[in-house]
């Protein structure tokens, strides 16, 4: 989750890079990997994510780790965002139990990382991108997969085009899932 408006698209970039690179199941030996490959990467601009994603993170049953990325450059706007980032991390880390009203409880104990930038310039942005690029490379090395091929993406496009060109199949399929016009 990014807590600076200028970084709002970073999560999408990291997700695309990570899942496209390491979201494969075939390793260098042309065998199916015995391990789960790329983790699911998702998130968004922190302030906008609070009423959807954070509900799930704080009260849902799935445990997951989160990276929080913020900027603390001394400006009032970024300081407010950075304080919100720290507050969210504390809430997710420590939680709160309310036995009288359990729907007001937050599980806590969610592993969180904080990446704090002191400025948003080419050097700090490059450093931040390099962290995630290196993570993708190390994951691929451990998993024994090629992070640079895109066979699945290409095959998906080919299969979609084949399905699209099969008009009879599409007609039958959609007639089964959509209600007829009245």
Predicted regions and their residues:
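A SIS-like phosphosugar-recognition module
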Residues: 1-182
